[in-house]
Structures are given as structure tokens and as C-alpha cells.
């Protein structure tokens, strides 16, 4: 199987100390390598949208990142504001604490509120799989399928672990073939990206996109 890795990559920079210069460089790399999207914090959406105007590279914004523990109303507003600023995709973090507390209706309402404010803008829902049991992963994936979101996503890359092959396979098996699955966190080289794609990922979130498309190894500190 020949894989066009660039088509899978959300070229990502989410560090709290990321500078505007670094975001501009991220966008330049995305244009050069024809990545699917860049993924940035919502405060940098206007910069990314300006840099990528007139190109095929989409702007993705994270919401409620990285903890997912804020007010539902704040998440919904942030999504709406990011879209207004130029975001073409939204990646939100679920409230993991609510899930672990058994507050299933609240978790679902949290996702639905953001989805409703996204309207036609694709929504990806970050599970933070490293903190969840297999049963909880299935539970959230089924919830997302019911809510008709575009993607389920493994990780923020800011917790105790990133994407794992077995979690991607489980997510794909749960949501079926019509939803997207995004593997993110610790995908730093071509071999790992290939493993995730073969497991069922249709998008890869990584700060190592250039290394992946060039067949090199990124640093261990990369997202």
C-alpha cells in the first residue's frame, strides 16, 4: 500500500510558549508539503488563517485544550469564536473527569453544545485514551457516533500517553467506516504513522509532519 502521508497530517503546534513566528513557520511548512491542515490554539487561528488564505491547507483549532474541564458554555463559545476567526475544523477535549464520575449525560451534552455551535464545521472529539478504559473509549465513541460528529481523536499529547495502535483499532471498530479517526500524540516517524493508518486512522495529528513525509526521525520531545 502506497500512502500519501501528507494527506493525513494535521501539522500541529500547541505549545503554550509557541510564538507567532513559529506559527508562521508551521504554516509555511504545511504549504510546502501540502499537509491536510495545521492545528493551533484558538488564539493563533487569525494568524494561521491569514497565512493559509488561498491554499488548500485547512486551519484546525483546539477547544478546551488540553484539560477539557472548563465550562461547557465556554467551550461552545470558543468553538464559535474560532470558526468566526477562520477555523475550518474544531478539535475539542471531552471532560474526562465527568466521564470517570459517571456523569454520562453531562459529557454528551458538553459535546453536543460544541457540535451545535460548529454547525457545518467538522468537529473532532479528543478522548484522551491514555486515561480511559477500553469500555470508556467505546462509550465515548458510541456517544460521538450518535451525535454525528466528524471524528474521534485519541489524545491531546499533553497527558500521560499518546496514540496507541490498539486504541485506534478499537475506536475504528466502534465508530465504523463512516466516521474519521484521528491518531495524535507520539506519532513522530513514518513507521508509527503507517501503523496508525493501517489500524484505522484517517488523520494524524503531529508536530513531526516534515520528518514523516521525508522519512526521518523527529526528536522525542515532538508532539
Curated annotation (Swiss-Prot):
Question: Which processes are annotated in GO (biological process)?
Answer: 2-deoxyribose 1-phosphate catabolic process; carbohydrate catabolic process; deoxyribonucleotide catabolic process
What does the record give under GO molecular function?
deoxyribose-phosphate aldolase activity
Q: Per the UniProt record, which EC number(s) apply here? A: 4.1.2.4
The signal peptide here is none
Q: What are the UniProt keywords, alphabetically?
A: Cytoplasm, Lyase, Schiff base
* Enzyme class (EC, first level): lyase
The residues annotated as the active site are: 91, 153, 182
What the entry lists under InterPro entries is as follows: Aldolase_TIM, DeoC, DeoC/FbaB/LacD_aldolase, DeoC_typeI
Q: Which GO terms describe its cellular component?
A: cytoplasm
Q: Principal localization?
A: cytoplasm
- Sorted alphabetically, which PANTHER family does this protein's record hold? DEOXYRIBOSE-PHOSPHATE ALDOLASE
UniProt-recorded name of the protein? Deoxyribose-phosphate aldolase
Q: Which organism is it from?
A: Yersinia enterocolitica serotype O:8 / biotype 1B (strain NCTC 13174 / 8081)
Amino acid at each position: 500500500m502506497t500512502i500519501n502521508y501528507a494527506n493525513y497530517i494535521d501539522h500541529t503546534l500547541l505549545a503554550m510558549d509557541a510564538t507567532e513566528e513559529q506559527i508562521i513557520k508551521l504554516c509555511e511548512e504545511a504549504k510546502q508539503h501540502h499537509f491536510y491542515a495545521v492545528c493551533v490554539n484558538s488564539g493563533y487561528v487569525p494568524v494561521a488563517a491569514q497565512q493559509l488564505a488561498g491554499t488548500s491547507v485547512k486551519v484546525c483549532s483546539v477547544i478546551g485544550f488540553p484539560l477539557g474541564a472548563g465550562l461547557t458554555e465556554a467551550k461552545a463559545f470558543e468553538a464559535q469564536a474560532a470558526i468566526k476567526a477562520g477555523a475550518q475544523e474544531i478539535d475539542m477535549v471531552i471532560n474526562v473527569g465527568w466521564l470517570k464520575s459517571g456523569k454520562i449525560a453531562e459529557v454528551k451534552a458538553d459535546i453536543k453544545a460544541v457540535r451545535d455551535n460548529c454547525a457545518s464545521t467538522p468537529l473532532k472529539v479528543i478522548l484522551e485514551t491514555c486515561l480511559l478504559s477500553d469500555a470508556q473509549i467505546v462509550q465515548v465513541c458510541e456517544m460521538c457516533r450518535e451525535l454525528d460528529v466528524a471524528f474521534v481523536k485519541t489524545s491531546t499529547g499533553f497527558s500521560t500517553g499518546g496514540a496507541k495502535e490498539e486504541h485506534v483499532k478499537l475506536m475504528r471498530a466502534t465508530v465504523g467506516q463512516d466516521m474519521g479517526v484521528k491518531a495524535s500524540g507520539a506519532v513522530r516517524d513514518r513507521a508509527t504513522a503507517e501503523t496508525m493508518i493501517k489500524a484505522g486512522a484517517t488523520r494524524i495529528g503531529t508536530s513531526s509532519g516534515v520528518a514523516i513525509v521525508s522519512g526521518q526521525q523527529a526528536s522525542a520531545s515532538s508532539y
